[in-house]
Amino acid sequence: MSRLEAAVNGKKNLFIPFITAGDPNPEVTIELALTLEEAGADILELGIPYSDPLADGPVIQAASKRALKHEMTLEKALSLVPKMRAQGLTIPVIVFTYVNPLLQYGEEQFVKRAADYQVDGILVPDMPFEEGEVLQAACQEHNLSLISLVAPTSNKRIEKIAARAQGFVYCVSSLGVTGLRDELDPRVHEFLQTVKTHASVPVVVGFGISRREQVEALAENADGVVVGSAIVKLVGELEDELNDPEKLEDGLFKIKRFVSELISS
């Protein structure tokens, strides 16, 4: 059983935070990962910063800009994972990358590199499901999970994607880019139920989740939540503290407290 399979096996209320590699700087990204595991994260989603992030709203776009100031590349982002492991990170790491940098690097080469660096899965939001055969084969060869992203589209397409999902199915709570939302789309529950009827792996939901009430409401039909913009926004607000070695501990504590309050039942 892989590290990811072990993490999700029979577990409810999975918490999957998203952070951007290199934000606010590479060293603090490692500290953030460790802090998030301490706060209760089951899986870490690590975003590769990119200059043209189609699925990301302004909060995560700003995080990419902060990371790119440190010349964070796909290779450098991947290399953070073994450093996290060396400092005690035990949870699975899913790498979130867009298709252009992936193709420039080479799909098979990227997967091999990710496996060498102890990554557990890959998520490519702008790669159509039908075009993922090369990536799927490479992931299978190197024992990585290719995470399926499912949007509220036709039932036939949902069934096709959910049935072939690995690790977990990542459901998009609403169409559009990532970002904080005051209210979730009321149709999300029906959508999650549809996905669950076809999936043999846990069903998690992301995009727009930022409050404990939303986490609690989604627990009825989802096996877990992905929280990105709310955490990344806080990282941006605490940028000065996190970049100051004397204030770093206080900044990390504030993030841990926010996450603990978000997922406490």
From Swiss-Prot:
Catalytic function, reaction form: (1S,2R)-1-C-(indol-3-yl)glycerol 3-phosphate + L-serine = D-glyceraldehyde 3-phosphate + L-tryptophan + H2O
Annotated metabolic or biological route of this protein: Amino-acid biosynthesis; L-tryptophan biosynthesis; L-tryptophan from chorismate: step 5/5
Enzyme Commission designation: 4.2.1.20
Any one GO molecular-function label of the UniProt entry: tryptophan synthase activity
A cellular-component GO term for this protein: cytosol
Active site: 45, 56
Domain of life: Bacteria
UniProt xrefs under InterPro entries: Aldolase_TIM, RibuloseP-bd_barrel, Trp_synthase_alpha_AS, Trp_synthase_suA
Function as written in the Swiss-Prot or TrEMBL entry: The alpha subunit is responsible for the aldol cleavage of indoleglycerol phosphate to indole and glyceraldehyde 3-phosphate.
HAMAP family: Trp_synth_alpha
The family this protein is said to belong to: Belongs to the TrpA family.
Subunit and interaction comment: Tetramer of two alpha and two beta chains.
Designated name of the protein: Tryptophan synthase alpha chain
